[in-house]
Amino acid sequence: LAETELVSLATTVGTPYLTNISSLSKGGTILNISLRDLGPEVILQCDNVVDDVDHVCRAQTSPHLAEQQVGHRDFIRCSLAAILSDKEPARQTDTDISIFSPFGLGILDIALAQMVAKLAVETGKGVKIPAFLPEPWAKTL
């Protein structure tokens, strides 16, 4: 992991198993897709970005466990929206390890849909639907 800049966690675990990330390269990014792999101690030592603070701090996610441990959410630096709207920098420093925890983003749905659409175009399979909404709805928009 010392030379790895990006780690994506996508598992079905219910309790954290990663409690030490000292071997991860400085300035790396962890995509906390499955939300329960990282121990609270890892969350608390990293730069945390989330899609929705209220969503991510529930259901025994890693950020939720960190919140329970320290009694606040101050370890979450900002939301993805704050970064995309230039209200916050993407990174605090070049050496911090950043964790992105996307609870309500549907990131896996988006990734799968992109892959399916790409394969459909490449193989010439599938049916293109010109409009998603029924015609009466489309006229009112």
Feature map (PLM): residue ranges:
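Rossmann-fold NAD(P) dinucleotide-binding segment
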Residues: 2-33
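Fold-independent oxyanion-binding glycine-rich loops
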Residues: 10-12, 33-35, 52-53, 102
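Short glycine-rich, flexible loops that bind phosphorylated cofactors or substrates
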Residues: 15-17, 38-39, 57-58
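Adenosine-phosphate binding glycine-rich loop
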Residues: 41-140
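Short loop/helix-cap segments at secondary-structure boundaries that form the rim of catalytic
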Residues: 1, 25, 39-44
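Preference for short coil/turn "hinge" residues that link or interrupt alpha-helices
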Residues: 17, 31, 35-36, 98-100, ...
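Short, solvent-exposed polar/charged micro-motifs at secondary-structure junctions
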Residues: 2-4, 138-141
